[in-house]
Protein backbone atom coordinates (compact mmCIF):
# COMPACT_ATOMS: atom_id res chain seq x y z
CA UNK A 1 0.00 0.00 0.00
CA UNK A 2 1.18 3.54 -0.82
CA UNK A 3 2.80 5.56 1.95
CA UNK A 4 0.20 8.11 3.18
CA UNK A 5 1.29 11.72 2.52
CA UNK A 6 -1.91 13.29 3.86
CA UNK A 7 -2.76 12.70 7.52
CA UNK A 8 -4.41 14.34 10.55
CA UNK A 9 -2.32 15.92 13.31
CA UNK A 10 -2.70 16.31 17.06
CA UNK A 11 -1.14 19.67 17.84
CA UNK A 12 0.64 21.10 20.88
CA UNK A 13 -1.10 23.61 23.17
CA UNK A 14 0.97 26.24 25.00
CA UNK A 15 -0.60 27.39 28.27
CA UNK A 16 1.15 30.76 28.61
CA UNK A 17 -0.26 33.02 31.34
CA UNK A 18 -1.51 35.66 28.86
CA UNK A 19 -3.91 33.23 27.18
CA UNK A 20 -7.70 33.24 27.44
CA UNK A 21 -8.95 30.92 30.15
CA UNK A 22 -10.98 27.73 29.64
CA UNK A 23 -13.77 27.70 27.06
CA UNK A 24 -13.43 31.48 26.50
CA UNK A 25 -10.33 30.56 24.48
CA UNK A 26 -10.69 29.78 20.77
CA UNK A 27 -7.67 27.49 21.16
CA UNK A 28 -9.52 25.47 23.83
CA UNK A 29 -12.73 25.37 21.76
CA UNK A 30 -10.91 24.11 18.64
CA UNK A 31 -9.20 21.48 20.77
CA UNK A 32 -12.42 20.30 22.41
CA UNK A 33 -14.36 20.14 19.12
CA UNK A 34 -11.66 18.16 17.29
CA UNK A 35 -11.15 15.65 20.11
CA UNK A 36 -14.18 14.81 22.29
CA UNK A 37 -11.88 13.16 24.87
CA UNK A 38 -10.17 16.50 25.61
CA UNK A 39 -10.97 17.86 29.06
CA UNK A 40 -10.86 21.67 29.13
CA UNK A 41 -9.88 23.11 32.53
CA UNK A 42 -11.96 26.25 33.10
CA UNK A 43 -9.24 27.76 35.31
CA UNK A 44 -6.27 27.28 32.93
CA UNK A 45 -5.13 29.53 30.06
CA UNK A 46 -5.09 28.12 26.52
CA UNK A 47 -2.84 30.61 24.73
CA UNK A 48 -1.45 29.01 21.57
CA UNK A 49 -2.03 26.01 19.34
CA UNK A 50 1.17 25.13 17.43
CA UNK A 51 0.66 23.40 14.08
CA UNK A 52 4.02 22.40 12.67
CA UNK A 53 7.32 20.66 13.33
CA UNK A 54 9.03 23.11 15.70
CA UNK A 55 11.17 21.20 18.26
CA UNK A 56 9.30 22.90 21.15
CA UNK A 57 5.91 21.89 19.77
CA UNK A 58 6.20 19.08 17.22
CA UNK A 59 2.73 17.84 16.15
CA UNK A 60 1.85 14.16 16.66
CA UNK A 61 0.71 12.13 13.63
CA UNK A 62 -2.74 10.53 14.02
CA UNK A 63 -2.33 7.69 11.51
CA UNK A 64 -1.36 4.24 12.76
CA UNK A 65 -0.01 3.25 9.31
CA UNK A 66 2.86 5.71 9.85
CA UNK A 67 5.76 4.54 12.05
CA UNK A 68 7.09 8.02 12.90
CA UNK A 69 5.38 9.60 15.89
CA UNK A 70 5.79 13.30 15.05
CA UNK A 71 5.60 15.51 11.98
CA UNK A 72 9.24 16.60 12.40
CA UNK A 73 10.45 12.98 12.40
CA UNK A 74 8.29 12.11 9.39
CA UNK A 75 9.45 15.12 7.32
CA UNK A 76 13.12 14.31 8.11
CA UNK A 77 12.58 10.89 6.46
CA UNK A 78 10.20 12.09 3.71
CA UNK A 79 11.78 15.35 2.58
CA UNK A 80 10.29 15.12 -0.92
CA UNK A 81 6.89 15.71 0.69
CA UNK A 82 7.99 19.35 1.20
CA UNK A 83 8.11 19.97 -2.57
CA UNK A 84 11.38 20.19 -4.48
CA UNK A 85 11.89 23.98 -4.23
CA UNK A 86 10.92 24.12 -0.54
CA UNK A 87 13.21 21.18 0.26
CA UNK A 88 16.17 22.79 -1.55
CA UNK A 89 15.58 26.34 -0.24
CA UNK A 90 15.01 25.41 3.42
CA UNK A 91 17.42 22.45 3.81
CA UNK A 92 14.77 19.77 4.06
CA UNK A 93 12.80 21.47 6.85
CA UNK A 94 9.26 22.85 7.06
CA UNK A 95 9.94 26.62 6.88
CA UNK A 96 6.90 27.88 8.79
CA UNK A 97 5.08 27.49 12.08
CA UNK A 98 1.29 27.87 11.96
CA UNK A 99 -0.59 28.88 15.13
CA UNK A 100 -3.89 29.90 16.68
CA UNK A 101 -3.57 32.51 19.46
CA UNK A 102 -6.17 33.40 22.11
CA UNK A 103 -4.98 36.57 23.88
CA UNK A 104 -6.50 37.78 27.17
CA UNK A 105 -3.71 40.01 28.52
CA UNK A 106 -1.16 41.90 26.43
CA UNK A 107 1.94 40.16 25.10
CA UNK A 108 5.23 42.01 25.41
CA UNK A 109 6.06 44.83 23.01
CA UNK A 110 8.68 43.23 20.82
CA UNK A 111 10.45 43.15 17.49
CA UNK A 112 12.13 40.34 15.63
CA UNK A 113 15.59 40.72 14.07
CA UNK A 114 16.30 40.32 10.37
CA UNK A 115 18.43 37.35 9.29
CA UNK A 116 21.75 39.22 9.45
CA UNK A 117 21.12 40.54 12.99
CA UNK A 118 19.66 37.20 14.15
CA UNK A 119 22.90 35.43 13.19
CA UNK A 120 24.96 38.03 15.08
CA UNK A 121 22.75 37.98 18.23
CA UNK A 122 22.66 34.17 18.28
CA UNK A 123 26.47 34.05 18.25
CA UNK A 124 26.77 36.73 20.96
CA UNK A 125 24.01 35.60 23.35
CA UNK A 126 22.49 32.20 22.51
CA UNK A 127 20.75 32.11 25.92
CA UNK A 128 18.55 35.05 24.79
CA UNK A 129 18.53 34.40 21.02
CA UNK A 130 18.10 30.66 20.52
CA UNK A 131 18.55 30.45 16.72
CA UNK A 132 19.99 32.33 13.74
CA UNK A 133 16.77 32.76 11.76
CA UNK A 134 14.60 35.80 11.09
CA UNK A 135 10.99 35.73 12.28
CA UNK A 136 8.57 37.63 10.05
CA UNK A 137 4.99 36.88 11.13
CA UNK A 138 1.43 37.53 10.04
CA UNK A 139 -1.73 37.62 12.18
CA UNK A 140 -5.21 37.10 10.68
CA UNK A 141 -8.10 37.90 13.03
CA UNK A 142 -10.66 35.22 13.95
CA UNK A 143 -12.47 37.57 16.38
CA UNK A 144 -11.99 41.36 16.77
CA UNK A 145 -8.25 41.50 17.46
CA UNK A 146 -6.38 44.43 19.00
CA UNK A 147 -2.67 45.09 18.68
CA UNK A 148 0.06 47.71 18.52
CA UNK A 149 2.10 47.82 15.32
CA UNK A 150 4.76 50.19 13.96
CA UNK A 151 5.35 53.85 14.81
CA UNK A 152 2.45 56.28 14.57
CA UNK A 153 2.55 59.30 12.22
CA UNK A 154 4.70 62.00 13.88
CA UNK A 155 1.80 64.48 14.14
CA UNK A 156 -0.16 61.97 16.27
CA UNK A 157 2.80 61.52 18.64
CA UNK A 158 3.28 65.29 18.89
CA UNK A 159 -0.42 65.63 19.85
CA UNK A 160 0.04 63.04 22.64
CA UNK A 161 3.14 64.89 23.87
CA UNK A 162 0.93 68.00 24.28
CA UNK A 163 -1.99 66.19 25.91
CA UNK A 164 -0.03 63.79 28.15
CA UNK A 165 2.54 65.78 30.18
CA UNK A 166 3.58 62.59 32.02
CA UNK A 167 4.64 61.08 28.67
CA UNK A 168 6.38 64.30 27.63
CA UNK A 169 8.39 64.45 30.86
CA UNK A 170 9.91 61.02 30.09
CA UNK A 171 10.72 61.92 26.48
CA UNK A 172 12.26 65.24 27.57
CA UNK A 173 12.13 68.73 26.10
CA UNK A 174 15.01 68.36 23.64
CA UNK A 175 13.72 65.14 22.05
CA UNK A 176 10.19 66.64 21.90
CA UNK A 177 11.51 69.78 20.16
CA UNK A 178 13.50 67.66 17.69
CA UNK A 179 10.40 65.60 16.84
CA UNK A 180 8.26 68.72 16.22
CA UNK A 181 10.99 70.24 14.03
CA UNK A 182 11.36 67.01 12.01
CA UNK A 183 7.79 67.32 10.69
CA UNK A 184 9.08 69.91 8.18
CA UNK A 185 12.32 68.10 7.36
CA UNK A 186 11.44 64.84 5.58
CA UNK A 187 11.41 61.13 6.38
CA UNK A 188 15.07 60.73 7.45
CA UNK A 189 14.77 63.51 10.05
CA UNK A 190 11.49 62.06 11.36
CA UNK A 191 12.96 58.56 11.76
CA UNK A 192 16.00 59.99 13.54
CA UNK A 193 13.81 62.09 15.89
CA UNK A 194 11.58 59.07 16.62
CA UNK A 195 14.63 56.98 17.49
CA UNK A 196 15.74 59.71 19.90
CA UNK A 197 12.27 59.84 21.54
CA UNK A 198 12.00 56.07 21.85
CA UNK A 199 15.55 55.75 23.24
CA UNK A 200 14.84 58.45 25.85
CA UNK A 201 11.68 56.62 26.91
CA UNK A 202 13.32 53.18 27.12
CA UNK A 203 16.33 54.51 29.06
CA UNK A 204 14.21 56.37 31.65
CA UNK A 205 14.90 55.53 35.29
CA UNK A 206 12.46 52.96 36.64
CA UNK A 207 11.59 55.19 39.62
CA UNK A 208 10.67 58.11 37.33
CA UNK A 209 8.61 55.85 35.04
CA UNK A 210 6.59 54.55 38.00
CA UNK A 211 6.01 58.09 39.35
CA UNK A 212 4.82 59.46 36.00
CA UNK A 213 2.67 56.41 35.29
CA UNK A 214 1.00 56.66 38.71
CA UNK A 215 0.24 60.35 38.06
CA UNK A 216 -1.27 59.54 34.67
CA UNK A 217 -3.32 56.60 35.98
CA UNK A 218 -4.69 58.76 38.80
CA UNK A 219 -5.59 61.58 36.40
CA UNK A 220 -7.34 59.28 33.91
CA UNK A 221 -9.19 57.36 36.66
CA UNK A 222 -10.52 60.60 38.19
CA UNK A 223 -11.70 61.94 34.83
CA UNK A 224 -13.43 58.67 33.93
CA UNK A 225 -15.13 58.45 37.36
CA UNK A 226 -16.39 62.02 36.75
CA UNK A 227 -18.04 60.76 33.57
CA UNK A 228 -15.49 62.29 31.15
CA UNK A 229 -14.22 60.36 28.12
CA UNK A 230 -10.44 59.96 27.96
CA UNK A 231 -10.47 58.33 24.52
CA UNK A 232 -8.36 61.13 23.05
CA UNK A 233 -5.40 59.83 25.11
CA UNK A 234 -6.37 56.10 24.97
CA UNK A 235 -7.36 56.30 28.66
CA UNK A 236 -9.17 52.96 28.97
CA UNK A 237 -6.31 51.12 27.24
CA UNK A 238 -3.70 52.75 29.48
CA UNK A 239 -5.61 51.68 32.62
CA UNK A 240 -6.00 48.16 31.24
CA UNK A 241 -2.26 47.80 30.48
CA UNK A 242 -1.26 49.34 33.82
CA UNK A 243 -3.51 46.85 35.62
CA UNK A 244 -1.83 43.99 33.73
CA UNK A 245 1.75 45.34 34.03
CA UNK A 246 1.90 47.91 36.88
CA UNK A 247 4.74 50.41 36.56
CA UNK A 248 5.85 49.02 33.19
CA UNK A 249 7.53 51.33 30.65
CA UNK A 250 5.49 49.62 27.90
CA UNK A 251 2.30 51.37 29.08
CA UNK A 252 3.65 54.59 27.50
CA UNK A 253 4.33 52.85 24.17
CA UNK A 254 0.65 53.27 23.21
CA UNK A 255 1.51 56.92 22.49
CA UNK A 256 4.27 55.96 20.05
CA UNK A 257 2.83 52.88 18.30
CA UNK A 258 -0.26 52.50 16.12
CA UNK A 259 -3.28 50.94 17.82
CA UNK A 260 -4.95 48.57 15.36
CA UNK A 261 -8.21 46.64 15.69
CA UNK A 262 -8.57 43.92 13.06
CA UNK A 263 -12.01 42.65 12.06
CA UNK A 264 -12.30 38.88 11.43
CA UNK A 265 -10.44 38.10 8.19
CA UNK A 266 -8.28 41.26 8.35
CA UNK A 267 -4.53 40.78 8.74
CA UNK A 268 -1.35 42.56 9.76
CA UNK A 269 2.10 41.54 8.55
CA UNK A 270 5.00 42.17 10.94
CA UNK A 271 8.28 42.56 9.11
CA UNK A 272 11.68 42.35 10.76
CA UNK A 273 12.45 45.24 13.13
CA UNK A 274 8.84 46.52 13.37
CA UNK A 275 7.78 46.98 17.03
CA UNK A 276 4.46 45.32 17.86
CA UNK A 277 2.37 43.80 20.63
CA UNK A 278 -0.79 41.71 20.58
CA UNK A 279 -3.27 43.08 23.13
CA UNK A 280 -6.51 41.07 22.96
CA UNK A 281 -8.49 38.67 20.78
CA UNK A 282 -8.13 35.48 18.74
CA UNK A 283 -6.11 35.09 15.56
CA UNK A 284 -4.47 32.67 13.20
CA UNK A 285 -0.73 33.39 13.00
CA UNK A 286 1.95 32.17 10.64
CA UNK A 287 5.66 32.82 11.01
CA UNK A 288 9.10 31.69 9.95
CA UNK A 289 10.35 28.89 12.19
CA UNK A 290 12.24 30.92 14.82
CA UNK A 291 12.07 31.86 18.49
CA UNK A 292 14.04 35.12 18.33
CA UNK A 293 12.41 38.04 20.12
CA UNK A 294 13.81 41.39 21.27
CA UNK A 295 11.49 42.75 23.98
CA UNK A 296 10.67 46.37 24.76
CA UNK A 297 8.09 46.39 27.54
CA UNK A 298 4.89 44.86 29.00
CA UNK A 299 7.04 42.01 30.21
CA UNK A 300 8.84 40.72 33.30
CA UNK A 301 11.42 39.09 30.96
CA UNK A 302 14.88 40.21 29.82
CA UNK A 303 14.87 43.55 27.93
CA UNK A 304 17.86 44.22 25.67
CA UNK A 305 17.36 48.01 25.43
CA UNK A 306 20.45 48.92 23.41
CA UNK A 307 19.89 46.19 20.77
CA UNK A 308 16.25 47.16 20.55
CA UNK A 309 16.83 50.90 20.08
CA UNK A 310 19.44 50.25 17.37
CA UNK A 311 17.49 47.65 15.39
CA UNK A 312 13.98 49.15 15.14
CA UNK A 313 12.43 50.43 11.95
CA UNK A 314 11.51 54.02 12.87
CA UNK A 315 9.44 54.71 9.74
CA UNK A 316 6.20 56.42 10.83
CA UNK A 317 3.01 55.34 9.05
CA UNK A 318 -0.75 55.52 9.68
CA UNK A 319 -2.42 52.43 11.12
CA UNK A 320 -4.32 51.71 7.88
CA UNK A 321 -0.96 51.15 6.12
CA UNK A 322 -0.23 48.32 8.55
CA UNK A 323 -3.21 46.26 7.33
CA UNK A 324 -2.23 43.46 4.96
CA UNK A 325 -4.93 42.74 2.37
CA UNK A 326 -5.37 39.31 0.79
CA UNK A 327 -5.78 38.82 -2.97
CA UNK A 328 -8.81 36.94 -4.26
CA UNK A 329 -8.01 33.92 -6.43
CA UNK A 330 -8.82 34.32 -10.15
CA UNK A 331 -9.74 30.64 -10.45
CA UNK A 332 -11.49 29.83 -7.17
CA UNK A 333 -14.30 32.08 -5.85
CA UNK A 334 -13.88 30.67 -2.32
CA UNK A 335 -10.12 31.30 -1.98
CA UNK A 336 -8.27 34.36 -0.59
CA UNK A 337 -4.46 34.41 -0.47
CA UNK A 338 -2.36 36.30 2.10
CA UNK A 339 1.07 36.30 0.45
CA UNK A 340 3.57 38.48 2.37
CA UNK A 341 6.89 39.64 0.86
CA UNK A 342 8.95 36.84 2.46
CA UNK A 343 9.62 33.36 1.02
CA UNK A 344 8.93 31.39 4.23
CA UNK A 345 5.12 31.25 4.23
CA UNK A 346 1.78 32.11 2.63
CA UNK A 347 -1.65 31.65 4.21
CA UNK A 348 -4.82 30.80 2.30
CA UNK A 349 -8.33 31.39 3.58
CA UNK A 350 -11.04 29.14 2.16
CA UNK A 351 -14.70 30.06 2.74
CA UNK A 352 -17.11 27.57 1.17
CA UNK A 353 -20.89 28.07 1.48
CA UNK A 354 -22.85 25.20 3.00
CA UNK A 355 -24.82 24.79 -0.25
CA UNK A 356 -21.71 23.33 -1.94
CA UNK A 357 -21.33 19.56 -1.51
CA UNK A 358 -17.68 19.07 -2.54
CA UNK A 359 -14.60 21.32 -2.69
CA UNK A 360 -11.25 20.51 -4.33
CA UNK A 361 -8.29 21.85 -2.33
CA UNK A 362 -5.73 23.55 -4.61
CA UNK A 363 -2.84 21.18 -5.39
CA UNK A 364 0.50 22.82 -4.52
CA UNK A 365 4.18 22.03 -4.99
CA UNK A 366 4.57 22.64 -1.25
CA UNK A 367 3.76 20.85 1.96
CA UNK A 368 0.86 22.55 3.72
CA UNK A 369 -1.08 22.46 6.97
CA UNK A 370 -4.84 22.92 6.88
CA UNK A 371 -6.96 24.01 9.86
CA UNK A 372 -10.74 23.62 9.84
CA UNK A 373 -12.17 26.53 11.89
CA UNK A 374 -15.84 26.00 10.99
CA UNK A 375 -17.72 23.12 9.40
CA UNK A 376 -17.60 19.32 9.12
CA UNK A 377 -16.04 17.48 6.18
CA UNK A 378 -14.63 14.20 4.99
CA UNK A 379 -11.26 14.63 3.29
CA UNK A 380 -10.92 12.25 0.35
CA UNK A 381 -7.36 11.32 -0.64
CA UNK A 382 -7.38 9.70 -4.12
CA UNK A 383 -3.66 8.68 -4.01
CA UNK A 384 -4.33 6.12 -1.25
CA UNK A 385 -8.11 5.76 -1.68
CA UNK A 386 -8.39 7.11 1.85
CA UNK A 387 -10.96 9.13 3.78
CA UNK A 388 -10.31 11.31 6.84
CA UNK A 389 -13.22 12.79 8.81
CA UNK A 390 -12.55 16.34 10.04
CA UNK A 391 -14.65 18.53 12.34
CA UNK A 392 -14.06 22.03 13.73
CA UNK A 393 -10.49 22.20 15.07
CA UNK A 394 -9.27 19.38 12.82
CA UNK A 395 -5.73 19.79 11.43
CA UNK A 396 -4.48 18.07 8.28
CA UNK A 397 -0.95 17.79 6.88
CA UNK A 398 -0.94 17.69 3.06
CA UNK A 399 2.26 16.61 1.30
CA UNK A 400 3.38 18.47 -1.84
CA UNK A 401 1.43 17.70 -5.05
CA UNK A 402 -1.25 15.69 -3.22
CA UNK A 403 -4.88 15.98 -4.29
CA UNK A 404 -7.48 16.42 -1.53
CA UNK A 405 -11.25 16.68 -1.98
CA UNK A 406 -13.43 17.90 0.87
CA UNK A 407 -16.95 16.49 1.05
CA UNK A 408 -19.23 18.65 3.21
CA UNK A 409 -20.92 16.16 5.53
CA UNK A 410 -23.11 18.86 7.14
CA UNK A 411 -24.60 21.68 5.00
CA UNK A 412 -22.90 24.45 6.99
CA UNK A 413 -20.39 27.04 5.78
CA UNK A 414 -16.71 26.05 5.89
CA UNK A 415 -13.95 28.33 7.14
CA UNK A 416 -10.47 26.93 6.57
CA UNK A 417 -6.98 28.40 6.89
CA UNK A 418 -4.06 26.73 5.14
CA UNK A 419 -0.36 27.54 5.58
CA UNK A 420 2.07 26.73 2.77
CA UNK A 421 5.22 27.98 1.05
CA UNK A 422 4.79 29.42 -2.48
CA UNK A 423 8.26 29.79 -4.00
Curated annotation (Swiss-Prot):
Q: Which family does it belong to?
A: Belongs to the mannose-6-phosphate isomerase type 1 family.
- Please list the GO biological process terms of this entry: GDP-D-mannose biosynthetic process from fructose-6-phosphate; GDP-mannose biosynthetic process; mannose to fructose-6-phosphate catabolic process
Functionally, this protein is described as follows: Isomerase that catalyzes the interconversion of fructose-6-P and mannose-6-P and has a critical role in the supply of D-mannose derivatives required for many eukaryotic glycosylation reactions.
Identify the pathway.
Nucleotide-sugar biosynthesis; GDP-alpha-D-mannose biosynthesis; alpha-D-mannose 1-phosphate from D-fructose 6-phosphate: step 1/2
Cofactor(s) needed, names only, are:
Zn(2+)
Single GO MF descriptor: mannose-6-phosphate isomerase activity
Q: Main localization of the protein? A: cytoplasm
Instruction: Return the GO cellular component terms, semicolon-separated.
Output: cytosol
| Organism lineage | Eukaryota, Metazoa, Chordata, Craniata, Vertebrata
- Pfam families documented for this protein: PMI_typeI_C, PMI_typeI_cat, PMI_typeI_hel
Reactions accelerated catalytically: D-mannose 6-phosphate = D-fructose 6-phosphate
What's the name of the protein?
Mannose-6-phosphate isomerase
Q: How is the cofactor bound?
A: Binds 1 zinc ion per subunit.
Report the locations given in the UniProt record.
Cytoplasm
* Active site (catalytic residues): 295
Q: Which residues carry this modification: Phosphoserine?
A: 102, 108
Q: Which residues bind Zn(2+)?
A: 110, 112, 137, 276
N-acetylalanine-modified residues are 2
Keywords in alphabetical order: Acetylation, Cytoplasm, Isomerase, Metal-binding, Phosphoprotein, Zinc
According to its UniProt record, the EC number is 5.3.1.8
Q: Which CDD domains match?
A: cupin_PMI_type_I_N
Q: Which PANTHER family match?
A: MANNOSE-6-PHOSPHATE ISOMERASE
Amino acid sequence: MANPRVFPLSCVVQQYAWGKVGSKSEVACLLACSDPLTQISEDKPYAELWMGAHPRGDAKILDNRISQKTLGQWIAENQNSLGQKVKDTFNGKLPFLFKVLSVETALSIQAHPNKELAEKLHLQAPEHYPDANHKPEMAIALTPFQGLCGFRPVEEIVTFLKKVPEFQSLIGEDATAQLKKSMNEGSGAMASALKNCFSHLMKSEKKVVVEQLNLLVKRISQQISNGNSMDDICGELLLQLHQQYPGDIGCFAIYLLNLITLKPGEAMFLEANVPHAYLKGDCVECMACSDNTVRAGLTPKFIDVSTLCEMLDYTPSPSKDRLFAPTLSQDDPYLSIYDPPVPDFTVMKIEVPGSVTEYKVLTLDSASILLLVQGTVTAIIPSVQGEIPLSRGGVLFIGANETVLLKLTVPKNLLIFRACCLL
